[in-house]
Amino acid sequence: MKFIIKLFPEITIKSQSVRLRFIKILTGNIRNVLKHYDETLAVVRHWDNIEVRAKDENQRLAIRDALTRIPGIHHILEVEDVPFTDMHDIFEKALAQYREQLEGKTFCVRVKRRGKHEFSSIEVERYVGGGLNQHIESARVKLTNPDVTVHLEVEDDRLLLIKGRYEGIGGFPIGTQEDVLSLISGGFDSGVSSYMLMRRGCRVHYCFFNLGGAAHEIGVRQVAHYLWNRFGSSHRVRFVAINFEPVVGEILEKVDDGQMGVVLKRMMVRAASKVAERYGVQALVTGEALGQVSSQTLTNLRLIDNVSDTLILRPLISYDKEHIINLARQIGTEDFARTMPEYCGVISKSPTVKAIKAKIEAEEENFDFSILDKVVEEANNVDIREIAQQTQQEVVEVETVSGFGPNDVILDIRSVDEQDDKPLKVEGVDVVSLPFYKLSTKFGDLDQSKTWLLWCERGVMSRLQALYLREQGFENVKAYRP
């Protein structure tokens, strides 16, 4: 099996040295991601494309799907690489490959050619197109907007029969730009903004300010792990959790009601800047959009930025909520965001939309900054790859079982698409499907006389959700790992 990786167009217009560096980094990223599927897989870089060759046909769909989610790839061609002798041989191979696909359809042939040959690309298009038209009675040629375009590539004595084209996410390869720290809350905005910076070539680390206890952190860990695993797993990143409840308590006690929102954001930027400086990160990323809430007016954003020298990136600054939600749906974080527990310890009855710097600074003079220093010092820093392991260590009260008893039911908490692609069937026990994002609202409707064994493919989500349900008072849950 062979895939041809086509580069994002912005890479191809770089200078020779920069283009070569980007291609080298992208090649390494592809190897890092795909080695989990096939250790014998070969990734070979060229000036115009990257080849991926693998032997394990069972991993074809998984490899193809993974490639479409690696930043820097414009599209992927799944090809069959065969030798040929002459133009008629090319036609015969094309006929065998595309006959069924062209039945009753309009088509055209498009050929790309590299190397020295006795024919041109146009001559191959005419010869193959004419032959297909003669040998497939129900098909007819249509050069503009055909039903099917037959793509062929001729390189020296090899013919590439294009079996399928699949769009990538584009952007720059991760690692071509410097690291950033995303202030992630688990909602729509922060997830999308994190994705946008990954797509632009940044390694995105995550900083979470916990205002609402373990359940909130569990949910945010899920979002961060999902984003990393889906779009950024070629690189190691950090997940930093800061317990911000003491800071919120100090704000509630010492700060005027109308200034609370801006002061809280300033404290978050101060804390995140300290974390960024500690790890050599160049910029912060937030999901703020202009005018979305009271703290996101230009005046207030300027005051928030003033507390730190660290660059703050806001990729969603001009986006409306509908656009952001649509992007969240495309990248798969919508369901997380919709069910994310919302905690706001600082709720102003009449928040200011045009804060005055002198007044904000006067309010902050009452704040005990040693509290802020302490929570940053005690921040929990985790390699995002270890989230599963740490969850297992932390959730000692959630039992993990490999077997089942007469009163047990397996609860498949994967997404609907994953369940449809690979249904779970276990002999001797009932299996019930309930996607993870519906557990908070639907688990209570299940038969509570049963013991529910939560299952997902990697075991991360099942343990996190089991802890969440335990915290909600459900004692009849365990994690299932056969």
Curated annotation (Swiss-Prot):
The active site is at C456 (cysteine persulfide intermediate). Its main location: cytoplasm. One of its GO terms (biological process) is tRNA 4-thiouridine biosynthesis. Residues 404-482 form the Rhodanese domain. Its EC number is 2.8.1.4. It comes from the Bacteria. Pfam families: ThiI, ThiI_fer, THUMP. GO terms for molecular function: ATP binding; CCA tRNA nucleotidyltransferase activity; tRNA binding; tRNA-uracil-4 sulfurtransferase activity. Residues 61-165 form the THUMP domain. Keywords: ATP-binding, Cytoplasm, Disulfide bond, Nucleotide-binding, Redox-active center, RNA-binding, Thiamine biosynthesis, Transferase, tRNA-binding. ATP binds at L183, I184, K265, G287, Q296. One of its GO terms (cellular component) is cytosol. InterPro entries: Rhodanese-like_dom, Rhodanese-like_dom_sf, Rossmann-like_a/b/a_fold, ThiI_AANH, ThiI_fer, ThiI_N, THII_Thiazole_biosynth_dom, THUMP_dom. NCBIfam families: ThiI_C_thiazole, tRNA uracil 4-sulfurtransferase ThiI. This is tRNA sulfurtransferase. The lineage of its organism: Bacteria, Pseudomonadati, Pseudomonadota, Gammaproteobacteria, Enterobacterales.
